[in-house]
């Protein structure tokens, strides 16, 4: 049975009670940092701006190295604050230039998440995680087999950007190696709404990483109420993990569809576009799996759905399709569609005047491609154990054959 952990049960990291907790400044966006400097430190707002630039532009975490701060202010910062970035367990480059980091979450060494940098001509995209594991159970995703532990804090989310940007030698507004961020790593971002939105604010802030709103993309499996809330609280690009254009098939791939079927999902996407003149399209991600969702009829269903969406928002190319060849992982029952089937599927969509691209597989030699991230999860569900038993049963059957 596919298990879905609903948002109400997802909890953030427990607060330590053994000693007064210092404020991790990575947990704060500009507004929060200004408030902390005024209320806790009794300092002017511009001091918060200075510190924010030290952290995100120069990658300095030691207050004593922030040379334009006075000695008294540095002492107050040492007393009340800290800058804790994720610990890098390992970093692994791919032959195609993709780079993956395994980052420890917390101090117990039991949980870790993966972050991936994907360079391309004229751009560099960072794929960022939002949870340790995932609260959903999409049947074709490696992360789902690991179960779920907890939401990431704002510091742990923006810390992934900090680690990658520092490694790349990224200098905001000058030498920009990191041009795009996609919330497409481990986890469902909208199940960790507040922390994700706060982190995306830092990504887009000139005192942070200075990315344009359209260059920060949040990908969701389709939490309809949270899409509506996102429309009022942020202005980033929206991507939807669709993977099927009919409810019966999508429910087997994305169990959340049982709660929020395709019609409701598409209506929420239309509301998202209507909510701001800055938004002109939604990207619909469609992972192609051999014999599952890659047949001509599936393409025609998707084309009809995209035309209906364009009509609903009265805009051509409001719905863009990103076809993703399935990336296998150990124990999966799915296979990647053949190149012939992928191109035939795309042609049907293009002939129907649906803007469609095929995502080039990157980083699969280091298990960094879409759907392959799994990290290290102390599972609070039964999913990891169930998947392990499935693998063992499969090995026994293979040995007996």
From Swiss-Prot:
SUPFAM superfamilies per the UniProt record, alphabetical: Radical SAM enzymes
Top EC class of this enzyme: transferase
Keyword ATP-binding in annotation: no
**What keywords were assigned to this record?**
4Fe-4S, Cytoplasm, Disulfide bond, Iron, Iron-sulfur, Metal-binding, Methyltransferase, rRNA processing, S-adenosyl-L-methionine, Transferase, tRNA processing
Task: Explain how, and how many, cofactor molecules are bound.
Answer: Binds 1 [4Fe-4S] cluster. The cluster is coordinated with 3 cysteines and an exchangeable S-adenosyl-L-methionine.
InterPro entries reported for this sequence: Aldolase_TIM, Methyltransferase_A, RlmN_N, RNA_MTrfase_RlmN, rRNA_lsu_MTrfase_RlmN/Cfr, rSAM
GO biological process terms on file = rRNA base methylation; tRNA methylation
Name the coenzymes or cofactors required: [4Fe-4S] cluster
Q: What Pfam families does UniProt report for this protein, alphabetically?
A: Radical_SAM, RlmN_N
Provide the binding site for [4Fe-4S] cluster: 134, 138, 141
Q: State if Cell wall biogenesis/degradation is listed as a keyword.
A: no
Tell me what reaction this enzyme catalyses: adenosine(2503) in 23S rRNA + 2 reduced [2Fe-2S]-[ferredoxin] + 2 S-adenosyl-L-methionine = 2-methyladenosine(2503) in 23S rRNA + 5'-deoxyadenosine + L-methionine + 2 oxidized [2Fe-2S]-[ferredoxin] + S-adenosyl-L-homocysteine; adenosine(37) in tRNA + 2 reduced [2Fe-2S]-[ferredoxin] + 2 S-adenosyl-L-methionine = 2-methyladenosine(37) in tRNA + 5'-deoxyadenosine + L-methionine + 2 oxidized [2Fe-2S]-[ferredoxin] + S-adenosyl-L-homocysteine
Residues annotated as the enzyme's active site? 114 (proton acceptor), 370 (s-methylcysteine intermediate)
Molecular functions (GO terms) = 4 iron, 4 sulfur cluster binding; metal ion binding; rRNA (adenine(2503)-C2-)-methyltransferase activity; rRNA binding; tRNA (adenine(37)-C2)-methyltransferase activity; tRNA binding
- Compartments, as annotated in UniProt: Cytoplasm
Q: Which cysteines are joined by disulfide bonds?
A: 127-370
For binding S-adenosyl-L-methionine, which residues are annotated in this chain's numbering?
Answer: 187-188, 219, 241-243, 327
Gene Ontology cellular component terms for the protein in this record: cytoplasm
Which NCBIfam families has this protein been placed in? Answer: rRNA_mod_RlmN
Miscellaneous comment text of the record: Reaction proceeds by a ping-pong mechanism involving intermediate methylation of a conserved cysteine residue.
* Protein family according to the UniProt entry: Belongs to the radical SAM superfamily. RlmN family.
**Function as written in the Swiss-Prot or TrEMBL entry:** Specifically methylates position 2 of adenine 2503 in 23S rRNA and position 2 of adenine 37 in tRNAs. m2A2503 modification seems to play a crucial role in the proofreading step occurring at the peptidyl transferase center and thus would serve to optimize ribosomal fidelity.
UniProt-recorded name of the protein: Dual-specificity RNA methyltransferase RlmN
Q: Which gene encodes it?
A: rlmN
